[in-house]
């Protein structure tokens, strides 16, 4: 009995240490999950009870057996009663031992699964889409009766879905014909885009004309471009300076190369070169499209085109500014992004803004002065805390399959249903990037590159 007691004490100490480790692990949930995916239960008590663990208790095991040959079953003998009481007591002790071992094994399995996960991501499993039913619920544990349907990327979440956290399968239809919207003033209105229940309202974009011209043209209204970014970290220096490739996704697994980007090695701040020539990612290349430059702390990024800053005839233009603030939901919470873009004219062309021209004011200076006449301000959609998955979630409509602090969606404050851009992880070095009007491929790719870069003041 002393050996069993000692073992119980050791297992109890290990269980307490593991519980403390799990509590510390969950105390800083900084990952953004896709709400249309299901994550395994965080607590081992919620696991299925179909799996059993068996243990050998040594010479004392026969006492708990119902076929114990040494057990005396007499009604009037006090000795028999004592043996029966001892057998019952030993049986309860053995059951507690088995229960402790079972809990210990579940905790070890739980910690092992956490340690195998990536530092920035955790794998998730896809929820099977529910068929339309009178009493089906959007969320796994939601009890609110609703009629569900097959979600599509064209659909977005409304504020009621975020309030009720009923976001696992929510995909309401975008409202048509808004009365007033700041998008119309800046040429950013997306109300003309057709809406549907998933089948074909919004067409998928394709490359038109030359690649170098296409990547700089704003996306037409009502067109969605589904892209994929791959990160190449093979080679001597690519562990610290990987190369990123942007492809436009096509049917049957086909893809079209659009842009490539890499971080310059000899630069005081983060500086990315973007080119439409995958074989020559340099400023002197014919396919050079622009660059992304950050400040010292990595909290502010500016996107430029391929123009020359010293030229007076055609100075370098500002394409976007990305600002990262401190985490919005805690020290290790999701990032808070602000993206400032040039405004759009009536013919769906960008307003030309150049910080290199002494006669003009750059995008960042206009934003600091609160001069919003020729610029448009976007923010990342705030993730919602999900009690079931113990994480922050966003509805990516199946386009994102892993959690990461890099996952985000860009919207305008006055029209949160219109997702201008979304970006998220699907595997270790593969990410999806979808964008709409008024972004172009160069702007969207540069915004994604800023998400990859390290941020001293935000981490």
From Swiss-Prot:
Location of region: Disordered: 114-205
InterPro entries, sorted: Tubby-like_C, Tubby_C, Tubby_C_CS
Protein family membership: Belongs to the TUB family.
GO BP terms, alphabetized: protein localization to cilium
Membrane topology reported for the UniProt record: Peripheral membrane protein
Keyword field: Cell membrane, Cell projection, Cytoplasm, Membrane, Nucleus, Phosphoprotein
Name of the protein: Protein king tubby
Record flagged with keyword Cytoplasm: yes
Phosphoserine PTM sites in chain numbering: 152
């Amino acid at each position: 009995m002393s050996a069993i007691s000692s073992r119980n004490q050791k297992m109890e100490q290990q269980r307490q240490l593991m519980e403390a480790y799990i509590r510390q692990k969950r105390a800083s949930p900084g990952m953004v999950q896709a709400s249309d995916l299901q994550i395994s239960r965080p607590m081992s008590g919620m696991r299925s009870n179909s799996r059993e663990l068996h243990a050998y208790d040594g010479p004392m095991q026969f006492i708990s057996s119902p076929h114990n040959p040494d057990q005396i079953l007499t009604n009037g003998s006090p000795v028999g009663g004592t043996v029966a009481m001892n057998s019952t007591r030993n049986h309860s002790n053995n059951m507690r031992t088995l229960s402790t071992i079972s809990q210990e094994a579940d905790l070890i399995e739980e910690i092992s699964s956490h340690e195998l996960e990536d530092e920035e991501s955790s794998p998730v499993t896809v929820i099977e889409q529910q068929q339309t039913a009178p009493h089906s619920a959007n969320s796994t544990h939601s009890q609110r009766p609703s009629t569900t349907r097959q979600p599509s990327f064209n659909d977005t979440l409304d504020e009621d879905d975020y309030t009720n956290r009923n976001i696992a399968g929510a995909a309401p239809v975008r409202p048509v014909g808004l009365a007033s919207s700041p998008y119309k003033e800046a040429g950013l209105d997306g109300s003309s885009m057709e809406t549907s229940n998933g089948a074909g309202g919004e067409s998928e974009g394709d490359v038109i004309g030359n690649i170098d011209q296409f990547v700089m043209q704003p996306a037409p209204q009502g067109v969605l471009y589904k892209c994929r970014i791959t990160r190449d970290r093979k080679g001597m220096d690519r562990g610290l300076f990987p190369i990123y490739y942007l492809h436009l996704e096509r049917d049957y697994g086909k893809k079209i190369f659009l842009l490539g980007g890499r971080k310059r090695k000899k630069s005081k701040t983060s500086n990315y070169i973007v080119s439409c020539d995958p074989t020559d990612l340099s400023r002197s290349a014919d396919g050079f499209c622009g660059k992304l430059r950050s400040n010292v702390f990595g909290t502010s990024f500016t996107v430029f085109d391929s123009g020359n800053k010293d030229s007076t005839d055609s100075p370098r233009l500002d394409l976007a500014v990305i600002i990262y603030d401190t985490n919005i939901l805690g020290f290790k919470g999701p990032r808070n992004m602000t993206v400032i873009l040039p405004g759009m004219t009536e013919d769906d062309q960008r307003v030309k803004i150049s910080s290199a021209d002494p006669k003009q004011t750059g995008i960042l200076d206009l934003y600091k002065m609160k001069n919003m006449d020729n610029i448009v301000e976007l923010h990342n959609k705030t993730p919602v805390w999900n009690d079931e998955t113990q994480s922050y979630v966003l509805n990516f409509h199946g386009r994102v399959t892993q959690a990461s602090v890099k996952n985000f969606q860009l919207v305008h404050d006055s029209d949160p249903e219109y997702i201008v851009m979304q970006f998220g992880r699907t595997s270790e070095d593969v990410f999806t990037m979808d964008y709409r009007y008024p972004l172009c491929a160069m702007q969207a790719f540069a915004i994604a590159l800023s998400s990859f870069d390290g941020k001293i003041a935000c981490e």
